[in-house]
Amino acid sequence: HMCVGSTVGPNIFVKICGWSTAQISKELKIQLKKEFKTIPNKVKLINCVGGGSSAYGFWSEFIDYDKKQIELIGVEAGGPKKSKLHAAPLSKGAKLGILHGAAAYCCQDNEGQIKETESISAGLDYPSVSPIHCFLKDTKRARYTYATDEAALNAYKMVTKFEKLNPSLEPSHAFAEAIRIAPKLSKDTILIINSCGDAIKDRDILKGRLGKY
């Protein structure tokens, strides 16, 4: 038996995990209609992507919408600025490979062996990604990018300063992308970021890097 905590691996595990996390987007849809009376015309849903379970759950109810109305943006772990290692197979040109019983984009060496990854976020430090996200990338339904460790830390500092949130380092990657693109957007664009984890699990890392938690 396998115990899988993300939308990775053989199809049945992807289905089970995807079914359970889809509740996130069901709730979001209700909240949007309550806030705006309808689904707004310009929405960007930004989520971090490691294995990809929270991103799929966040997007599930919106995948069939036109991407001009609902844009799906996944943010992978770009690793430290000065390192060549990362955990961003979708946004850094990884090739198709086999890992944990599934075909997906994987960080590999020239011989097809799985490469070492590096990220400040343990939750994003995975050398592959859900086959669902590979499909969304290939069909251009979702856009994938990455944030470096430094960008994620800066985003964490900004969010905790101005919002009543204490996000873990995983969603801090998503916040980093939101901060990067926000100044370029029209005023009627709705940005929604899934703050999918609490920083209490990263407190030792944050103390080491920022001197406080």
Model-derived regions, located:
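Active-site/ligand-binding loops adjacent to catalytic centers
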Residues: 1-12, 16, 36, 64-69, ...
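A glycine-rich, Thr/Ser-enriched phosphate-binding loop motif common to dinucleotide/cofactor-binding enzymes
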Residues: 12-28, 168-173
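Glycine/aspartate-rich loop-and-adjacent alpha/beta segment that forms the canonical ThDP
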Residues: 16-23, 193-213
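Buried hydrophobic packing segments
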Residues: 28, 58-62, 156, 174-181
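Phosphate/pyrophosphate-binding loops at sites that engage ATP/ADP/AMP, CoA/4′-phosphopantetheine
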Residues: 29-39
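A short, small-residue-rich loop immediately preceding and capping a beta-strand
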Residues: 41-55, 72, 189-195
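Short glycine/serine/threonine-rich phosphate/pyrophosphate-binding segments
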Residues: 48-59, 82-84, 171-178, 200-203
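C-terminal structured "cap/appendage" subdomains that terminate the fold
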Residues: 160-194
